[in-house]
């Protein structure tokens, strides 16, 4: 469960290292975001000499959360960290690689480009 002011790791090579959620895209008073939700975030930490800079406002899709994700078949998935992938306005990832495992639910939410870049889909 990601809410405003939550810090997330970045799971791609876009140049950002850490994000802070400032808004959840969707309903106007939505409190929490889960895997597959799009958030508006600010870059808190970035690598030098990359297109993304610190304090830049971007969009990202959440790919891992510490909060459990319960599937219809009864399986429960939980990750060690909260992580997101930086995307552009069309929903395409800004990076060319995705690090770590991501959830299978992203494929059903039409983030197929992110799923194809991921090394492992759980």
From Swiss-Prot:
Keywords: Chloroplast, Plastid, Ribonucleoprotein, Ribosomal protein, RNA-binding, rRNA-binding
Similarity comment: family membership: Belongs to the universal ribosomal protein uL14 family.
Domain of life: Eukaryota
Pfam families named in the record: Ribosomal_L14 (PF00238)
Location of this chain's protein in the cell: Plastid, Chloroplast
Protein name: Large ribosomal subunit protein uL14c
GO terms, biological process: translation
Key word RNA-binding present: yes
Presence of keyword Methyltransferase: no
SMART domains: Ribosomal_L14
HAMAP family cross-referenced by the UniProt entry: Ribosomal_uL14
Function, as annotated: Binds to 23S rRNA.
GO CC entries: chloroplast; cytosolic large ribosomal subunit
Molecular function as annotated in GO: large ribosomal subunit rRNA binding; structural constituent of ribosome
Gene3D superfamilies membership: Ribosomal protein L14 (2.40.150.20)
UniProt cross-references to InterPro entries, sorted A to Z: Ribosomal_uL14, Ribosomal_uL14_bac-type, Ribosomal_uL14_CS, Ribosomal_uL14_sf
Annotated source species: Eucalyptus globulus subsp. globulus
Parts of the chain that traverse the membrane: none
Coiled-coil stretches: none
Subunit structure of this chain's protein: Part of the 50S ribosomal subunit.
């Amino acid at each position: 469960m990601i809410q405003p002011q939550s810090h997330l790791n970045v799971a791609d090579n876009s140049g950002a290292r850490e994000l802070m959620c400032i808004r959840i895209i969707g309903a106007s008073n939505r409190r929490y975001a889960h895997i597959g939700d799009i958030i508006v975030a600010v870059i808190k930490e970035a690598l030098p000499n990359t297109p993304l800079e610190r304090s830049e406002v971007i969009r990202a899709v959440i790919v891992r959360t510490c909060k459990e994700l319960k599937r219809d078949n009864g399986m429960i998935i939980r990750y060690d960290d909260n992580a997101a992938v930086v995307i552009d306005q069309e929903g395409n990832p800004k990076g060319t690689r995705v690090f770590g495992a991501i959830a299978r639910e992203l494929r059903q939410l039409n983030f197929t480009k992110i799923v194809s870049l991921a090394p492992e889909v759980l």
